[in-house]
Amino acid sequence: MRLIQRSVISLLLAFTASTALAQYYSGDHTYDGEHQNEASVSLITGKNIITGPCIGNNWHYKHYFNDHWSIDVGANTQYTKKLYGFKAKGEYHFIIQAFHLFASGEYMFNHYHRFNTNENVGNLSIRFERGYWDLALGASMIGYNLMGDHYTEPVTLTFGAHATLRPRTNNWNVGLLFRNYDDFYYENWNINWGMDFYYRFNPQWKMFGEFNIRPSGSMSQLASKYETTGKVGLIYRWK
């Protein structure tokens, strides 16, 4: 009998904590009311069967106009692959009950210099975010210019899921993810599996990192076997 009582009390406490978190959680990628600008830089390392070891950098700048609207621009360089990329994204944030939703439109351009190939990508997505997890759904249009020929793939489904060990309000966290996209690529059905972490020093500084494994067939790796990549970087917010 005592075991049943303790179980019921534990469930009630868990429900209460979850409800409180839903009320006070303010979104992982939202305007905090103070810092309108956000910049990040990260170092990328990896290896695949075609180009061997590779190294590169990502740069991002994000501006929050208010609690709803933001714009994000980024650049990517992977030196061994001779891959250069640029992207721009606009995002609208709104709340439905306890869910934070982010509707976004994005344009991405990648130039594979070694293979004389250009890639143009347009994406529309919506992301559902809670304190311990987030889900993304959308659609991508991917076009290639290869040696004078142009090819456009059919509309591709964008999907992703991410879950964290601790609530996002915590100063540190570890998570697991699977998705068919990353900072500078969108795939068909090739899923990117990985884990990530962050450590928030204060409201302005945050360190983050990821470790990913991708299967064969990825245009962005141009390989016939899996690729492993690691990423570590810093985010800085200011007024």
Describe the role of every protein-language-model region.
Residues 37, 65-73, 96-103, 131-137, ...:
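Repeated loop/turn-to-beta-strand initiation elements of outer-membrane beta-barrel proteins
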Residues 43-49, 75-81, 94, 105-113, ...:
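Transmembrane beta-strands of outer-membrane beta-barrel pores
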